[in-house]
Amino acid sequence: MHLVSVPPLLAFIKKHPASKQAVLTWCDEVKKAQWQHPADIKRQFATASILKSRRVVFNLKGNDYRVVVAVAYNMGFVYEIGRAHV
């Protein structure tokens, strides 16, 4: 998948240094993925929450951090639209 809007994730890492390894690992896994359907995401990330409008919430580092994305399955794009420190 092509991960769009990486700079906000890098800014998040700068603000929350403890998230660095989890966020970078997640980015690497997303870039290697080839999701065609929401079920593909659930197979790879069992704790991900599939929402309406192609949105997905990923829990990182034991749910300490969350990344919200929109997935364009047919185009192979993942758009990061939000992140949070829980």
Regions picked out by a protein language model, each given a short descriptive name:
Residues M1-D64, Y73-F77:
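Basic, Lys/Arg-enriched alpha-helical interface segments
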Residues A84-V86:
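Conserved small/polar residues in nucleotide/adenosyl-binding loops
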